[in-house]
């Protein structure tokens, strides 16, 4: 007989109840199914309709193409940082933003773990080399903010390194903004059952299974640790120069369209169609740590 498959069942406490979750079981537990959208006090009980989403997104993507023409004509620079828990929808939001932009002038940066050489450098150094030049739009799928979340939670940095990061980051970002880079920082926030449902979907899908790692499974039992680090990060790195934009992302469709609206409304580009952009849903998108309180 072959080696017995490793069990990946975890025990987690949600809402004061101890739950057992086996990600390898093809059946999603009822307690997850019931709250996969409403988890974390999400303000809607239904997802945005597909037809409404498709029409809205297309109009917003037309505006993003205008932004790119404006960047090339003026030499302006835009940089957007996408952060959030695992399975928060960062990649999908980036794709929706980037889909129709010219890849010569719009880049997605998704760095792997640092090399031995990079570990010996100044922490920010490997990120700075990817910052935009004149006319570019750069989107970071995770960023230097790894040091505010996953690294301290999983023990990949020391407490002193984490503390120093929270002090140094506002100074660095202030320099970027003063150098006329348009900097956007997005935190995509999801509920606990939402994350579990998305992990389960990845595990059961032959097309998405590569997205799920053992570290993701380990993170299921560290929800409160990640929450504490999230709150500390938002509190200490939300500044007038480089504010955090928080997006409730249980519904990926609402998250994406409101995130893109925020970018478009903040930029003074030629041909801007205010009616096509529409209004931001203030139940979905807000500013800084107070939005989650």
From Swiss-Prot:
Belongs to the polyphosphate kinase 2 (PPK2) family. Class I subfamily. Its EC number is 2.7.4.-. One of its GO terms (biological process) is ATP biosynthetic process. Uses inorganic polyphosphate (polyP) as a donor to convert ADP to ATP. It catalyses: [phosphate](n) + ATP = [phosphate](n+1) + ADP. One of its GO terms (molecular function) is polyphosphate kinase activity. The keyword Kinase applies. This is ADP-polyphosphate phosphotransferase. Keywords: ATP synthesis, Kinase, Transferase. PANTHER family: ADP-POLYPHOSPHATE PHOSPHOTRANSFERASE, POLYPHOSPHATE:AMP PHOSPHOTRANSFERASE-RELATED. It comes from Agrobacterium fabrum (strain C58 / ATCC 33970) (Agrobacterium tumefaciens (strain C58)).
């Amino acid at each position: 007989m072959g080696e017995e498959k490793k069990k990946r069942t975890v025990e987690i406490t949600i809402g004061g109840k101890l739950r057992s979750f086996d990600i390898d079981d093809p059946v999603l537990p009822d307690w997850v199914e019931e709250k996969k959208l409403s988890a974390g006090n999400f303000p809607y009980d239904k997802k945005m309709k597909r037809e409404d989403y498709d029409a809205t997104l297309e109009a917003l993507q037309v505006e993003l193409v205008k932004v790119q023409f404006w960047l090339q004509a003026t030499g302006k620079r835009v940089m957007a940082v996408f952060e959030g828990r695992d399975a928060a929808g960062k990649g999908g939001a980036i794709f929706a933003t980037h889909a129709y932009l010219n890849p010569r002038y719009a880049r997605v940066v998704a760095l792997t773990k640092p090399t031995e050489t990079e570990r010996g450098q100044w922490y920010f150094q490997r990120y700075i080399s990817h910052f935009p030049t004149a006319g570019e739009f750069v989107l970071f799928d995770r960023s230097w903010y790894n040091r505010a979340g996953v690294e301290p939670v999983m023990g990949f940095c020391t407490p002193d390194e984490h503390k120093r990061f929270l002090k140094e980051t506002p100074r660095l970002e202030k320099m970027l903004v003063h150098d006329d880079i348009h900097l956007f920082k997005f935190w995509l926030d999801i509920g606990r059952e939402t994350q579990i449902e998305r992990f389960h979907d990845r595990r059961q899908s032959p097309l998405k299974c590569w997205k799920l790692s053992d570290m993701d499974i380990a993170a299921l039992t560290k929800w409160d640790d990640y929450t504490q680090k999230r709150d500390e990060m938002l509190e200490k790195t939300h500044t007038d120069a480089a504010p955090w934009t928080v997006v409730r992302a249980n519904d990926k469709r609402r998250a994406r369209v409101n995130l893109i609206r925020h970018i478009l409304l903040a930029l003074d580009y030629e041909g801007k169609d205010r009616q096509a952009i529409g209004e931001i849903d203030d139940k979905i998108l807000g500013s800084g740590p107070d939005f989650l309180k």
